[in-house]
Amino acid sequence: MRTIQFREAICEAMSEEMRSDDSIYLMGEEVAEYNGAYKASKGMLDEFGPERVIDTPISELGFAGIAIGSTMTGNRPIVEYMTFNFSLVGTDQIINNAAKIRQMSGGQFKCPIVFRGPTASAGQLAATHSQAFENWFANTPGLKVIVPSNPYDAKGLLKSAIRDDDPVIFMESEQMYGDKGEVPDGEYTIPIGVADIKREGDDVTIVSFGKIIKEAFLAADKLAEDGISCEIIDLRTVRPMDHQIIFESVKKTNRLVILEEAWPFGNVATEITYQVQSRAFDYLDAPIEKINTADTPAPYSPVLLKEWLPNSEDVVKAVKKVLYK
C-alpha cells in the first residue's frame, strides 16, 4: 500500500468528492493561489478553477456566513480556517446558523457544510494560537466533530464529512500535515461516530484522539517494557461519541486513562468520565485518570510550553497510578 502525507490525504478527499459532485466547493484564506496555508489544497485551483476553489478576504464571519447561506440553495461547501483559533470570529455563524438551520426550519433546509483546519498547539504560537476547541463545538447540538490522528483516518472521515447532510467540524493539526501513513488507492470512507482500537491490551484502557494520541503510543511502548499491556482507543469522532467501544474495553481492562490536549475544565475527558462512571462503574478497579494541558493560557516559552502540554511521561504516571504501582 502506498504511503502519503496527512496533507495529501486531505487534498485527495476534497478533490475526489469535488470530481463526483459539482455542488461541492472550497473556500478560505489562501486556499487557491497559495495552495493552502499548509498546502492541503495543492493543485486544486488548477483542476477546479476559481469558482470552486475560492480565496477569501480575512473575514471569517463573512465567508462562514456566505458558505452557510449557500447550503440553502443546494451547495455543499468546505470552509478552511487557517487555524480554528480564527474560527472564533465566525462562531456566531457556526453555532447560531449552521447548527440550527435544520431544526429551526422544521426540516425544510439542511446544512451540508464542513469547517476544517488545524486545532490546538503547534509549537511556539503562544496563547491565542494554541487553543483546542473540539469540546466547545461538541457541546453544541447539531454539530458533528471529527479529530483524526493519521492520514488513513483523515481521508476516510473527511469524505464522509463532505457527504454528510449536517454541519461537520473537522479538526487537523499543523504538526500532523507532514505525517505519513498508508492510504489505499481505491475508494473508501470511514463512518462518522465510530472509534478505533489502535492497539490491543489487557491491563489498562487509554482513550485519546488527534495528534496528542502519539504520546499514548510512546507511553505504551515504555510501559510494555515493564510488562504492562495498554489498549489504546482513538475516538476519531468526538461527537457523536462511540461510548460502547470504551465501555467494552473498560470491562476487559478495568482501568481507564484519558489523554486530551485541552484545558481540564468541562472537556471531552470529563464527558467520557461521566459516561463510564454512569454505565460501567462496576467494572472499574480504580478511579479514572484524565490528563490535560495546564489550566492556563498556552505559554510562549519553550520550557514552559513543554510543562504545559501533556506528554508520554504523564501517561506513564497515570497508568501506574490506576494500576497502584
Question: What residue ranges belong to the model's regions?
Answer:
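Thiamine diphosphate
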Residues: M1-P167, M171, K306-E307, ...
